[in-house]
């Protein structure tokens, strides 16, 4: 605590402890507030050692001020404490935090007005970083590209080869350069000569197209007038530095040869990026255990190398990013809907594929399995085990609905028999629609007979008993008729022997 509290000593510490936290409040600043401010600065990745000087506190105030509108109350309290400390370092006589903030605003406003007045009175000067600068005589001269820029470019090519990020790197390092500077950058590359040959072919094609669309003027040029640049002039092979400067800086009909040449280089770099990145965006798929964040990084890196318009790239992002994700992430992304932002997708899929997500899926699977064991599947096995010949879905005897048995039914319990509805017996003892055997007992409720009984009803081969009795009665009636009329036929001559 001693090191943190040593920001103020002596008279400054006395002045710090006399300042009130709020107007009219009895509470004043103490050493603990300095300790707290130091810890908060470390939490915000700022250097607490800057609190020891007025310049350091001013830097901290400028750094924290943009975040005040959306910051928390702790951040606002930290900014107020630093403002009070800034006033103490500058020996301003203040009584509370509100006066310190007002004093800070007054000083900053007066400083800005003084700087604005100074800019109006001082002549404007051309930046010395620009390759074409104005010398003391007011002439436009060329400033050679610095060795540091060349070194940064060569290192980028050696480390990144021709990945998609090499294009914005080239655009940043060649800002405002003339063709002479750009050729210097290209000649500094030692390797990748095959790729550079492809780049030269693209430059030659663009130069030929420029000559076709911008034919040179016929006849001699007027005295003092410079010729118009050709394709080879823009490429820097047939033009001098002075001509390139004049074409770029002349007032009327200026031609920015450097910018035109940079566009040609970018076209060639796009082909080289495609050549060094043969993977198509259609082949980028998320692995089963790959984090969604890594998959998004690979997706956008490959998308950056695609030779397509921005509309096509937007369509690829909206369609393929979700389509090529793994099943776990795809299920989450489809639930978010098509209007979800990339931030929402990454937050929703955070942790998918990791041990926590796997444990969660396993717990859900075990919970559903236990639920099934308590209800549906066990009920199916139990009910079908009683009658293996039954076909179709299971049906509840209590409510009459399919899909569960009466044991798991949530409807109110029926009273009496589940089959006929009468009270006094159970369904297993119900005699409604059932047949008794020779012992006077009824068959099982399933409708099947015991195993030692014939399962199908055997149809008898003999005629029914009623037909046999009728036939005997008919024969007896015929015998009576024969005895009543013995002489009605020749049969009576021989008696009953015939």
Swiss-Prot record:
Residues 12-19 are annotated as: Interaction with host AP3D1. The record marks 130-131, 362-363, 381-382, 437-438, 453-454 as: Cleavage. The keyword Phosphoprotein applies. Residues 447-483 are annotated as: Disordered. Residues 14-33 are annotated as: Interaction with membrane phosphatidylinositol 4,5-bisphosphate and RNA. Gag-Pol polyprotein: Specific enzymatic cleavages by the viral protease yield mature proteins. This is Gag polyprotein.
């Amino acid at each position: 605590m001693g090191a943190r509290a040593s920001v103020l000593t002596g008279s400054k510490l006395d002045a710090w402890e006399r300042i009130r936290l709020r107007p009219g409040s009895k509470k004043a600043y103490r050493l603990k507030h300095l300790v707290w401010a130091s810890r908060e600065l470390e939490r915000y990745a700022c250097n607490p050692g800057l609190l020891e000087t007025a310049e350091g506190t001013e830097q901290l105030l400028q750094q924290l001020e943009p975040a005040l509108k959306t910051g928390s109350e702790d951040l606002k309290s930290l900014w107020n404490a630093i403002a009070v400390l800034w006033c103490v370092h500058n020996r301003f006589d203040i009584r509370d935090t509100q006066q310190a903030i007002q004093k800070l605003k007054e000083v900053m406003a007066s400083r800005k007005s003084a700087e604005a007045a100074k800019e109006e009175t001082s002549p404007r000067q051309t930046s010395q970083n620009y390759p074409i600068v104005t010398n003391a005589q007011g002439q436009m001269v060329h400033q050679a590209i610095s060795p540091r820029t060349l070194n940064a470019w060569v290192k980028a090519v050696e480390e990144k080869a021709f990945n998609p990020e090499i294009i914005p790197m080239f655009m940043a390092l060649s800002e405002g350069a003339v063709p002479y500077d750009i050729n210097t950058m290209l000649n500094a590359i030692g390797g990748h000569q095959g790729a550079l040959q492809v780049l030269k072919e693209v430059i030659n094609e663009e130069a030929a197209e420029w000559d076709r669309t911008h034919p040179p003027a016929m006849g001699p040029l007027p005295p003092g007038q410079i010729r118009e640049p050709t394709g080879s002039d823009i490429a820097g092979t047939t033009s001098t530095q002075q001509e390139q400067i004049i074409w770029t800086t002349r007032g009327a009909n200026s031609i920015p040869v450097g910018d035109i040449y940079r566009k040609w280089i970018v076209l060639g770099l796009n082909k080289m990026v495609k050549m060094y990145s043969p993977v198509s965006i259609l082949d980028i798929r998320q692995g089963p255990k790959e984090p969604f964040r890594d998959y998004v990084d690979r997706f956008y890196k490959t998308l950056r190398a695609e030779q397509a318009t921005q509309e096509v790239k937007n369509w690829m992002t909206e369609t393929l990013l979700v389509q090529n994700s793994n099943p776990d992430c795809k299920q989450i992304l489809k639930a978010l809907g098509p209007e979800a932002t990339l931030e929402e997708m990454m937050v929703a899929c955070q942790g998918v594929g990791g041990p926590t997500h796997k444990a969660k899926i396993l717990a859900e699977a075990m919970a559903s399995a236990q639920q099934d064991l308590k209800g549906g599947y066990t009920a199916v096995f139990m009910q079908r085990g009683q009658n293996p010949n039954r076909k179709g879905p299971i049906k509840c005897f209590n409510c009459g609905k399919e899909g569960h048995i009466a044991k798991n039914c949530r409807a109110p319990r029926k009273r009496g028999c589940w089959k006929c509805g009468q009270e006094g017996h159970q369904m297993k003892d119900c005699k409604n629609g059932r047949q008794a055997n020779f012992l006077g007992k009824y068959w099982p409720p399933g409708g099947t007979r015991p195993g030692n009984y014939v399962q199908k009803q055997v149809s008898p081969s003999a005629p029914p008993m009623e037909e046999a009795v009728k036939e005997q009665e008919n024969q007896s009636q015929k015998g009576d008729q024969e005895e009543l009329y013995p002489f009605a036929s020749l049969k009576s001559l021989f008696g009953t022997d015939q």
